[in-house]
């Protein structure tokens, strides 16, 4: 059956700021306390969506979450009106305010793990929300992510959206950022490659930075998503590269159809893994980048592998890269050699995503890939599909509500909370989502 990959991109939220919340993500740590520009961040993301949509790659948008997230501050013992809660936490424990104001939901590669209908036992598209257990600020995302996905994939005959796994370290799950699908045409059954960093009883794990994904979580997600057991491989990421800042697999590898583009040191037991994939995926092609040409450090600093590998109708592929790759002579030199070599990659497309990159999120972090048949695509909430009208509407919305300068101190401004709620109220109507945010369901108000 014919099917296409639709990229659902996360829209950057109004409180996008640099707080260095993500230990193990070196860009996040390096840019801590810099001044951010939420308006520019949102527009950079929108331009990527629109440019790819115009090039014939189906695109959709996933909206931001409510931030600062007052209910969690109340759980932490801060009381009073919303304004009083903000004032107290800013004075007594500003690190909590930064955490509950993170715009990290924009990296929707961590929102969920997807199983296309061609791979599932019941013939539905399955989406399992990620619990993002390893980082407090990200562990807050799952309930609203679930509401948003159910509002977008709202036809229960075609889509099953599963709640996140229990919030315990043993079941730490980071979503599609640690998941690859390999195969032929999108509508054919594919091989799902789940990548984990640690498993219970196995001492092979990183020592400097945390391994966020467990094998136990990956196995549970595969079960929830009803993936045919004959179409699953579990592989461990190389713990040495996690210790060099590769906090998700999508920082060291990207797949599309029959191609796996990865660093030579991406996986533990990589030779055996690639042999297994060759045996089980027709036409499988591994493009391994040698450490002598691109070091792991350079891969992390440029986000070479946090790229999007997109298929054209003729079978050729486009590699979507952040501007940092073009600015690094060694990486750009390698990429031009890659273009000239015998492989499906025929074009490099570069985007300026500096606002997201400075927090450790490149092109691939910003998108959730969902393979859909034509019938399934028709069943998606049409209001989220990117086109000329939506692009203009969202740019106007960003101009109206987003600030062009934000520091950690600004997060205590009650006006920022009010602006955010008003903006999301309007956005949920524009995207026909219903009441997906807690402030809407509580009768809301702005105070």
Curated annotation (Swiss-Prot):
Pathway: Amino-acid degradation; L-arginine degradation via AST pathway; L-glutamate and succinate from L-arginine: step 2/5. Signal peptide: none annotated. One of its GO terms (biological process) is arginine catabolic process to succinate. Substrate binds at residues 19-28, 110, 137-138, 212, 250, 359. Transmembrane segments: none annotated. It catalyses: N(2)-succinyl-L-arginine + 2 H2O + 2 H(+) = N(2)-succinyl-L-ornithine + 2 NH4(+) + CO2. The active site is at residues 174, 248, 365. Disulfide bonds: none annotated. GO terms for molecular function: N-succinylarginine dihydrolase activity. Its EC number is 3.5.3.23. Keywords: Arginine metabolism, Hydrolase. It holds the Pfam family AstB. Catalyzes the hydrolysis of N(2)-succinylarginine into N(2)-succinylornithine, ammonia and CO(2). Belongs to the succinylarginine dihydrolase family. HAMAP family: AstB (MF_01172). PANTHER family: N-SUCCINYLARGININE DIHYDROLASE (PTHR30420:SF2). Homodimer. This is N-succinylarginine dihydrolase. The gene is astB.
């Amino acid at each position: 059956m014919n099917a296409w990959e639709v990229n659902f991109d996360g829209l950057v939220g109004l409180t996008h700021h640099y707080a260095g919340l993500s230990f193990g993500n070196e860009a996040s740590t390096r840019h801590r306390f810099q001044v951010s520009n939420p308006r520019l961040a949102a527009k950079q993301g929108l331009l990527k969506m629109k440019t790819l949509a115009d090039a014939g790659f189906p695109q959709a948008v996933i909206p931001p979450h409510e931030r600062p997230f007052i209910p969690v501050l109340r759980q932490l013992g801060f009381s009073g009106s919303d304004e009083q809660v903000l004032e107290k936490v800013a004075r007594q424990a500003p690190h909590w305010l930064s955490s509950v104001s993170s715009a990290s939901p924009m990296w929707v590669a961590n929102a969920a793990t997807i199983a296309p209908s061609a791979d599932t036992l019941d013939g539905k598209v399955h989406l399992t929300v990620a619990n993002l257990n390893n980082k407090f600020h990200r562990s807050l995302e799952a309930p609203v992510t679930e509401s948003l996905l159910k509002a977008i994939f709202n036809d229960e005959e075609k889509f099953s959206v599963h709640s996140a796994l229990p919030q315990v370290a043993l079941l730490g799950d980071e979503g599609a950022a640690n998941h690859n699908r390999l195969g032929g045409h999108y509508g054919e059954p594919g091989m799902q490659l789940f990548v984990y960093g640690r498993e219970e009883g196995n001492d092979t794990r990183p020592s400097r930075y945390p391994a966020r994904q467990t094998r136990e979580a990956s196995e549970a997600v595969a079960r929830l998503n009803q993936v045919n057991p004959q179409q699953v491989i579990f592989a461990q990421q190389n713990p040495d590269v996690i210790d060099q800042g590769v906090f998700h697999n999508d920082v060291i590898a990207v797949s599309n159809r029959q191609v796996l583009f990865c660093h030579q040191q991406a996986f533990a037991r990589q030779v055996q893994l690639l042999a297994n994939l060759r045996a089980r995926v027709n036409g499988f092609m591994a493009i391994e980048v040698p450490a002598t040409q691109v070091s792991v450090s350079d891969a992390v600093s440029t986000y070479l592998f946090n790229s999007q590998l997109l298929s054209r109708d003729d079978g050729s592929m486009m590699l979507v890269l952040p501007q940092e790759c073009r600015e690094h002579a060694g990486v750009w030199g390698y990429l031009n050699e890659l273009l000239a070599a015998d492989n499906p990659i025929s074009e490099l497309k570069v985007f300026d995503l500096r606002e997201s990159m400075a927090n450790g999120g490149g092109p691939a972090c910003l998108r959730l890939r969902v393979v859909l048949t034509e019938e399934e695509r028709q069943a998606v909430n049409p209001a989220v599909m990117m086109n000329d009208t939506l692009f203009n509407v969202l740019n106007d919305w960003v101009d109206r509500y987003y600030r062009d300068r934000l520091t950690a101190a600004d997060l205590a401004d009650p006006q920022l909370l009010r602006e955010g709620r008003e903006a999301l109220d309007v956005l949920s109507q524009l995207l026909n989502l219903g009441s997906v945010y807690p402030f809407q369901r509580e009768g809301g108000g702005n105070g």
